[in-house]
Amino acid sequence: MRYCRCQRATAEEPTMDKPAELNKLRWRSRRGMRELDHLFDRYLSHCWAQASEAERGVFLRFLDCEDDKLWRWLMGYEVCQDASFAALIVTMRALPA
């Protein structure tokens, strides 16, 4: 069962799947809030390698948001008005635990 559209099977190698680069991204996504850290880690594990450049750009912009906003959006307490962020939030929340 696929949980996000970015898990599509492709014959191409992802452009950024080198362990060092992925580790830097994991470090950048750390928030010190267990819920957020878990959601970001699941996205990076399940979707990042196959994500398009546009999807990656949205994720990188998403990381620049304030932690309290990220938490409210991802926990469903507040609706994000940015359509690209809203799509990412749906994807992240649908990933398996």
Curated annotation (Swiss-Prot):
Q: Which family does it belong to?
A: Belongs to the SdhE FAD assembly factor family.
Function of this protein?
An FAD assembly protein, which accelerates covalent attachment of the cofactor into other proteins. Plays an essential role in the assembly of succinate dehydrogenase (SDH, respiratory complex II), an enzyme complex that is a component of both the tricarboxylic acid cycle and the electron transport chain, and which couples the oxidation of succinate to fumarate with the reduction of ubiquinone (coenzyme Q) to ubiquinol. Required for flavinylation (covalent attachment of FAD) of the flavoprotein subunit SdhA of SDH and other flavinylated proteins as well.
Gene from which the chain derives: sdhE
Q: Which superkingdom is the protein from? A: Bacteria
Q: List the disulfide bonds.
A: none
| Keyword line | Chaperone, Cytoplasm
Which species does the entry assign this protein to?
Answer: Xylella fastidiosa (strain Temecula1 / ATCC 700964)
Compartmental location: Cytoplasm
Protein name in the entry: FAD assembly factor SdhE
Any single GO CC term annotated in Swiss-Prot or TrEMBL for this entry:
cytoplasm
InterPro entries attached to this UniProt entry? SDH, SDH_sf, SdhE_FAD_assembly_factor
Family annotation (Pfam families)? Sdh5
Which one GO biological process term can you cite for this protein?
Answer: succinate metabolic process
